[in-house]
Amino acid sequence: TPDQSSAASDVYKRQSDGRVFMIEASEVTRSALSTIDVTQSVCELSFDQSPACLVSSDAELVWQTIYRGRAIQAADTLGAAQYMLDQAVAYSLDRKQFNRVIGSFQAVKHMCAEMASQLEPCRAFAWYAGHAFDESTDDAPLTACHVKAHLAEVGQFVAKTSTEVHGGMGFTDLVGLHYWFKRIGFNRQLLGSPEAVRHEATELE
């Protein structure tokens, strides 16, 4: 789980029967986990015989939380991918080869254009996912599945292509692209891989 280190943060536990319980943060032991994404803290929660308060017996509450989380993850991936695109464009207009900026070469232009063309429609997609939950539309869960899966794929493409535009520099700490590359990779798996959420989407349709 993402690390909510504040002592005031409560922990919610879902039972197999769908019931949700709230546990005081002081009753939970947190163990930090190492992941590929160093920009986010993740921890394992453990508790035994901890006092808990029943919050809900509605199993749908948990799924609605997961769906909302997927929409948020998609928006986070969108932001990371946009940053990588911006960095690729800026680098292509600064880096020179053969006495010309590499952004003037057709191959590099195409790489940047392909990233932009795939990423731009995702803005409206992510916006609608948020709107669907704001308005509690019937297609909100389905939209969350699709936007999570789609942004995972587009984000991976942008991360890979942006790194290629930078050449060998893209893999160095000096540029820092690898932080966002790993962020996108981490988001891809969190709350369900594209394959898993698309399978869920077929069951929702």
Predicted feature residues:
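Acidic-glycine-rich active-site phosphate/pyrophosphate-binding loop
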Residues: 50-60, 99
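Flexible, small-/acidic-enriched active-site or ligand-binding loops
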Residues: 5, 24-54
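Single conserved hydrophobic/aromatic residue that forms the stacking wall/gate
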Residues: 1-15
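Exposed loop/turn and edge beta-strand positions of beta-sandwich/beta-sheet ligand-binding modules
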Residues: 2, 41, 145
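Hydrophobic beta-strand positions in blades of beta-propellers and related beta-sheet-rich domains
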Residues: 18-22
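A broadly conserved detector of short glycine/acidic/proline-rich loop/turn motifs that flank catalytic sites
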Residues: 17, 27, 49-51, 77, ...
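Short coil/turn linkers that connect adjacent helices within long alpha-helical scaffolds
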Residues: 11, 36, 95-98
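Alpha-helical interface subdomain recognition
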Residues: 65-205
